[in-house]
């Protein structure tokens, strides 16, 4: 982990340079599936996971033993607890049941890599009820802020991963705070993006450029101060596996070609952008906090493919993502009505990297349409004994060979 003094001023290697210098930080590569799998902080993650399991075991023990004093040894009692029903531990399952969809890797054990990814998702948890800590805020304020951050990312040609890192930092930071006022939201948001850009971008925008886009609302000193506050509140845990990281992995597995290395992206850029736009819309709704990033990415993929392909590339069973798929239906309907955007071209960005640049669509209008459809579907499901709203993928005979269909 970097020192605080290094965090603000450290320069990264030039974009496009190869060799060993380009692999100093695993976060520096975007489309590379291996980047999301190779984690320089793996040992730290293992320690954090060990602590989490110890905490979970302690909670399970406390639920069984209602009287804490039963575990305190006394001169006239045995050290072992008496009357404890150990049958509660029989069904204790601390390991994930998701099977690994990863192919055989030449540089690591695929099962170990997959376990590391699952452990990371379980470590970087979000609080779906954090808005209750802030009575002066409304979910719409979060929506407007994230939509604005998307626009900033497109203006500065920042990567999708940069935006989703900032979104993750913002949501997790807000879960650690109480009674935040709306006048601080923009400062928290732009500071989160400032941190994410320094982690992910090879040439991040300068500090004064982040202050400039706030139109004088946030000064450079305020951004630097909030940067440190956010990182301390997050306990310097700044390396989550974001929703777009999961999507990148799923797409890579779906289009895996045995003739090429798994390290190289092989999927169509246009289809990736279409699915990413659905996720861009969904993440603006605070309801996305109900689901993990892996589930969100798998559900979005389902709306463009099939249940079979989703299970193959994600390791999820249908029952594990069914609720999220149904929640995502109004958003998918809104996207399909207007049609997906074409792949945008950015000056100075290599053609093979265009799909990784975060774009900004008319998200707020689309979100209003999606939420209106959400209310209609909820009313239909309430009055009808038969559930409605799940978009059924085409039959297997009508799909593209790869199993994904563009809008």
Swiss-Prot record:
One of its GO terms (cellular component) is cytoplasm. The gene is CCNE1. Residues 1-14 have a biased composition (Basic and acidic residues). Phosphorylation by CDK2 triggers its release from CDK2 and degradation via the ubiquitin proteasome pathway. Keywords: Cell cycle, Cell division, Cyclin, Nucleus, Phosphoprotein. Residues 1-29, 383-407 are annotated as: Disordered. It holds the Pfam family Cyclin_N. One of its GO terms (molecular function) is cyclin-dependent protein serine/threonine kinase regulator activity. This is G1/S-specific cyclin-E1. It comes from Gallus gallus (Chicken). InterPro entries: Cyclin, Cyclin-like_dom, Cyclin-like_sf, Cyclin_C-dom, Cyclin_N, Cyclins_cyclin-box. The keyword Coiled coil does not apply. Its main location: nucleus. Belongs to the cyclin family. Cyclin E subfamily. It is found in: Nucleus. Essential for the control of the cell cycle at the G1/S (start) transition. Interacts with CDK2 protein kinase to form a serine/threonine kinase holoenzyme complex. The cyclin subunit imparts substrate specificity to the complex. PROSITE patterns: CYCLINS.
